[in-house]
From Swiss-Prot:
InterPro entries: Com_YlbF (IPR010368), YheA/YmcA-like_dom_sf (IPR023378)
Organism: Lactobacillus johnsonii (strain CNCM I-12250 / La1 / NCC 533)
Pfam family, one: Com_YlbF
Homology family: Belongs to the UPF0342 family.
Protein's name in the database: UPF0342 protein LJ_1677
Top-level taxon: Bacteria
Length: 117
């Protein structure tokens, strides 16, 4: 019998050996070593948490939060460390998405006979 959890744990270890993971790790180290970029990241993260909380509670985003969001987005577009981190993060998540699609394909295949032809 297959222990799928062992495979998942091995996949997590293998993930850490990919170029995409290593590139993101290096990018995050560069970001941490730049106080200005780190501060911007932390402000962006805090605002994203506030936006998510507002959305989850059905509250509209305040005008002040909208302006802050626009301001931070502009700063991010002009920050090389954050732009690099976002690019590396997107590459890693694209790979993870590809793996997830491969893993879930057999589930979709189970339903193929049920689909209208």
């Amino acid at each position: 019998m297959v222990n799928i959890y062992d495979n998942a744990n091995q996949l997590a270890k293998d993930l850490q050996e990919t170029e995409q993971f290593k590139d993101l790790k290096k990018s995050l180290e560069n970001l941490k070593n730049n106080p200005e970029s780190l501060d911007l990241y932390q402000r962006m993260d805090k605002l994203q948490q506030q936006i998510l909380a507002a959305q989850n509670s059905g509250q509209p985003l305040s005008e002040e939060a909208q302006k802050e969001y626009q301001k931070i987005n502009e700063e991010v577009r002009n920050n090389d460390e954050l732009k690099d981190m976002i690019t590396k993060e997107q590459a890693l998540f694209q790979m993870i998405n590809d793996v997830q699609q491969a893993m879930t394909k057999p589930i979709g295949d189970l339903y193929d006979d049920l689909k209208a032809k």
